[in-house]
């Protein structure tokens, strides 16, 4: 990206604004590409994955990476927020596109498990008793608990699952099942989470 500071005073504010918008759009697009790539690499290699692997996944140079995220903590927090938003937006979309509300719930819980891989990695970057960690945790709950509640309500209204399951309790249970999953190859957290979601079904 070229330096916009050399535009000079000759073109006036209007032209500079017009030229700046595409560059800001490109920067946002590059950042989103990096965040998507980092999330993918984190799931397979953990939050300590080499920067070059993330840059390669995104198809950009390491220099571009560091312009967006000077430190690993900056990257992890940005990925955390990015995945929270992606998870939140996926809920209503899955309700629209899935064959049944329970299928939407199962798919969404799978995305939530992917997110938890990144979330657990924050422990090495932010102290659990720090203000930053508490702020992110509150943000996570505020955004995702209502989405999970909407999916549960839709599945209950369709008669697929029991109606007494609380979103927070389900998410907490899924989170607990995922703890330590990346350090024990004999433990298949996804399988147990799948059994949990299946167990929500109403008996026929």
Residue ranges and their predicted role:
Residues 1-57, 74:
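Basic, helix-initiating cap at the start of DNA-binding domains
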Residues 30, 83, 87, 101, ...:
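Hydrophobic/aromatic residues within well-ordered alpha-helical segments
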Residues 46-47, 67, 162:
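Helix-turn-helix/winged-helix DNA-binding modules
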Residues 59-69:
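Short hydrophobic/aromatic patch on the recognition helix
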Residues 71-76, 87:
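Short amphipathic alpha-helical segment with a characteristic S/N-K-E followed by hydrophobic residues
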Residues 78, 89-118, 133:
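Hydrophobic alpha-helical connector segments
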Residues 85, 118, 125, 132-160, ...:
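Amphipathic alpha-helical packing segments from all-alpha helical-bundle domains
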């Amino acid at each position: 990206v070229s330096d916009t500071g050399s535009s000079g005073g000759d073109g006036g504010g209007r032209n500079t604004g017009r030229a700046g918008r595409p560059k800001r759009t490109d920067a946002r697009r590059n950042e989103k590409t990096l965040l998507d790539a980092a999330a993918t690499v984190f799931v397979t290699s953990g939050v300590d994955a080499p920067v070059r692997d993330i840059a390669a996944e995104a198809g950009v140079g390491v220099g571009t990476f560091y312009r967006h995220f000077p430190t690993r903590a900056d990257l992890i927090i940005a990925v955390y927020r990015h995945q929270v938003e992606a998870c939140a937006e996926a809920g209503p979309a899955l309700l629209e596109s899935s064959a049944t509300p329970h299928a939407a719930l199962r798919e969404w819980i799978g995305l939530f498990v992917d997110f938890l891989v990144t979330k657990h990695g924050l422990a090495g970057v932010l102290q659990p008793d720090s203000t930053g960690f508490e702020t992110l945790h509150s943000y996570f709950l505020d955004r995702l608990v209502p989405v999970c509640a909407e999916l549960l309500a839709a599945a209950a209204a369709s008669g697929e699952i029991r109606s007494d399951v609380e979103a927070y309790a389900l998410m907490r249970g899924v989170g607990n099942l995922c703890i330590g999953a990346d350090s024990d190859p004999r433990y298949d957290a996804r399988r147990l989470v799948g059994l949990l979601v299946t167990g929500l079904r109403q008996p026929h």
